[in-house]
């Protein structure tokens, strides 16, 4: 596997195919409700490519609030092609994501995931008990990592998206563009 790099917008279709392979039911998850219609945080969409150049791993982070006045990042989805799961690529993607978020000055990262896996990166449910997600989720899987000590102290409330919205043209703009063509 080559180095972990910033994801390119041209990789959107390959990323969606990889996510469909690894997480076919991801659209049903509460984390998706938070990500819908939003752009990932700048510089926090990472990709890994196999020896042939194809996308084999991806992770993204999204701007959210951990309750009122508590900016945070939501990590996910993290996906690695099944052929590359035994080589530590998921861990490398996690370490790169955490390191990049820290270098960019972010305070905390939240995720919904398997606590035993994410504990090795410092994630825990210790300070997420007063936070909740929209929709159905397994509370014990809501985990946090403070990049700055005390960043989750007093975090309470609904985790809400705050990132840039995806620009969607209005119906009138689409009609005008079609008429002009």
Question: What role is predicted for each listed range?
Answer:
Residues 20-60, 64-65:
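Active-site rim helix/loop that mediates acceptor-substrate recognition in acyltransferases
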Residues 64-75, 85:
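A conserved beta-turn-beta hairpin within the catalytic core of GNAT-like acetyltransferases
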Residues 2-15:
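A short beta-loop-alpha structural element at the N-terminal edge
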Residues 50-53, 83, 146-151:
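Short loop segments at secondary-structure junctions
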Residues 54, 68, 81-92, 104, ...:
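Conserved glycine-rich acetyl-CoA-binding loop
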Residues 132-178:
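C-terminal "cap" of GNAT-fold acetyltransferases
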Residues 103-107, 113-138:
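Conserved active-site alpha-helix within GNAT-family acetyltransferase domains
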Residues 75, 80, 86-99, 110-111:
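Conserved acetyl-CoA-binding loop-helix of GNAT-fold acetyltransferases
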